[in-house]
């Protein structure tokens, strides 16, 4: 495999679920935990083709890290002031 570029990674794990919409597949993958006492990472991969079926294992899938920001309204519990919070949703895109 060639050297990884900026914001690129590889993924190995087991397909937990997938759905498709808008011409893309969105596959949820569970990767092995770092050790017996930590939680396994859960990753979502966007692709133009299916990566497999539920329960299939995938290895060294080359992806680019992407994401987007979402804002939401909230009320500060101490002051009662209305404000906006922000979440960042990260997603991996299959390099096809």
Swiss-Prot record:
State the gene name recorded for this protein.
V
* UniProt KW keywords: DNA replication, DNA-binding
Tell me if DNA-binding is a UniProt keyword of this record: yes
Q: Name one GO molecular function term.
A: DNA binding
Name used for this protein in its record: DNA-Binding protein G5P
Query: What's the stated role of this polypeptide?
Result: Binds to DNA in a highly cooperative manner without pronounced sequence specificity. During synthesis of the single-stranded (progeny) viral DNA, prevents the conversion into the double-stranded replicative form. G5P is displaced by the capsid protein G8P during phage assembly on the inner bacterial membrane.
Q: Which family does it belong to?
A: Belongs to the inovirus G5P protein family.
Offer one example of a GO biological process linked to this entry: DNA replication
Q: Which residues form a coiled coil?
A: none
Subunit structure and binding partners: Homodimer.
């Amino acid at each position: 495999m060639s050297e990884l570029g900026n914001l690129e990674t590889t993924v190995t794990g087991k397909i937990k679920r997938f759905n498709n919409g808008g011409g893309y597949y969105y596959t949820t993958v569970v990767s092995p935990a770092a050790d017996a006492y930590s939680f396994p990472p859960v990753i979502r991969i966007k692709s133009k083709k299916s990566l497999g079926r539920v329960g299939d294992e995938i290895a060294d899938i080359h992806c680019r890290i992407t994401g987007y920001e979402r804002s939401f309204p909230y009320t500060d519990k101490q002051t009662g002031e209305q404000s906006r919070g922000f979440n960042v949703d990260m997603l991996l895109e299959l390099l096809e």
